[in-house]
């Protein structure tokens, strides 16, 4: 036997045999991107390709032979994930396996070409390596008596004369695995710095790195990374887009306004038609493209997880390519999957770079963590959510405060730090910024109604709307949807439209809880009213953690910034305009600076790319032909950039614009050379500005919950279980319009009223100039209508103990004549029956002073005798609008506060939840479980015992309020009412 080692290289030249490795796992990780020959540890033979015969893989396989290392197969080690590799020789053949259990020189990447590698210290300063085939889940063995490779041998069951640990000998002449190149040279160590120093570099707060998984994973073609490499990540898109893009219906409509647009779907290595700045349905974030941008000074990005249930449904319905194994269209499922993908991407890049923590792409969940990542010369990635029905709170969903709380906590625990309350469509959190055309069709499919609009105010630029859908009727699948809907909305085509819906009570709760958790609130995509109300909360709570990341807030008139955008900067929030080319960015960044420069905050403005999220990218500069960006160029960090090469395709900013994310690195240099110093410096200060904003948010003092919404109520009839309503769709508020009963609907504005106690009038939300009117008909059969809110007793009412009485005669009260939908509301002499009993139910109850009435009797929780002292008992009593009957529920601390003087809360004596234990009030104590009740729908559960609820022991005045086992009776159901 002749041993053939060069200088002894058990695991690879000087790199792996000098004792620099901390452990055997790191020895495996550091094989990444290496070039090695595989040597027998027993006889020194080397693995070599040979012609074995047969049809599989052209009859080529590998075996050990007594040869020099120069004649051996030299394998490039390409990681697929931690400790797993593809091994390719100089001819591009894979060390592979196939059924039943054979070795071959494979032609394709895949599980049968993937190897899990482990290492063991050989005791001589090196390592022996084991190879386990993923596809067969078997370990590789070498029979050194004949040179053969095998997994199992029926004729040699004891593996005699066999070994399973091998040496790796470093080489320098491997053919690299196919890969996109950054085409950037320089010392990456220059990106490192001191964590206490200001960050130099730019921020992109709006990326969609994982959008390849949204819309069921069947719309955005291409992956930012792939286990089997670029050939799989950026392959031909015809599988989901059809021949020549014929099935890319949504992409063609969005990008080209032409469902019949066609293009070449070929990807790697030629890329004839994609990626392109105006193509919306192909991935632009391949990790090597992102690495080029990172080398330009990109220091942080927000990875906005995007999903839209309606578009997902549409894509999975109309595109046959989506019918096989699509992802779930559920928003929360999609968010969880995309968070998983971001973690996998971090691990994949780490694997390429030599092991955990070695890569340049790092997820960050706090500003301190982000600063440490950046100081280490790496890219900080913050995770956010931009989805239409986050928390499963679409208009059609069953969604309540507990759902929002639980799922907000889940998202936080997943690492999410930024959230858009709305996106594209209205949801139960609030109204979204409205759009005409296809998005309005989606709004109907999502919410069951088209956008409900009003004329924008004097400060707000809105959208023009067409009645019907004149531009969409010829689009095949859209016309089918319109036929199914059978509706054509009518709009005033002469005005600018804004959404009439603002933030909901649930949205108010979300924003406050995000502030409590120091999360960052995104204002883009909110309706103007929603954004105003968010800013009201932000300002009231002195909280700076607010962002506009890609110019999707309403603008002001004549292209000016909206007052809400100005308010955002004035409180210390962060902004980034939607990206444009260098010429466009001068004004886009400049108008943000006009406001920021008047504040005490750092003059930093980011770039919001919104790539691969149904947003087009910057085209080439209009003067690029006469004044091009010249290649190569050296950026301010000393990196030299050549034109980017992906396979056979050369990308040039001057001709291609922002075709993929890597070309943002070229644009940064273009801005450096062509923009004013004011603008360029603001962009290069943007990562620091983002961090300072985030740090201010984390350091913000704890402040009280703030609700900016007016106290709208629904006037609820206890007999009919329906609400006062005006016939029509919030559009029939004319003098004399009859008041009727109808099923209570949270989004029906004409069912919502402001109880103006001073004027004793009920103003209707759909038209605040109209009030509930008794017509002066204080007699049996008198009408109840709406009328202009003039100074007249005809519009005045008194409200006491569930009774709405005419100001003209307190014995004449509002009466439900019929209990069905469209049942008439009139006036009748008081007799006390339930059809004369009305509750003023607030649209939200969190942190509001209300009384609580049981469904059975309509009577109120009452502190007995109004005694403001520890141990005072709680009873049921007729509602009389006293402090003893007034309570405020704190859903954050799960406490019910009494309005009596002092600071008292509902309390279970000694924590005794036995049936019949009477409740009391006691001095409020943080964290005391005796005072904690979970509100679920209309019940209050004790946190001590989830089977016990607050219960009215009787119907008579003075009946004790007790704890009792939940049975679902009406005496355990509680409704809030204003008084």
Regions of interest found by a model, annotated:
Residues 1-7:
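Bacterial N-terminal signal peptides that target proteins for export
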Residues 2, 185-186, 805:
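Residue-level detector of alpha-helical hydrophobic segments embedded in or interacting with membranes
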Residues 7-15:
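Bacterial N-terminal signal peptides
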Residues 17-19:
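N-terminal signal peptide c-region/cleavage motif recognized by signal peptidases
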Residues 23-179, 708-979:
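Lectin-like carbohydrate-binding module/patch detector with strong preference for beta-trefoil
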Residues 171-707:
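Extended, charged catalytic domains and RNA/DNA-binding interfaces, predominantly
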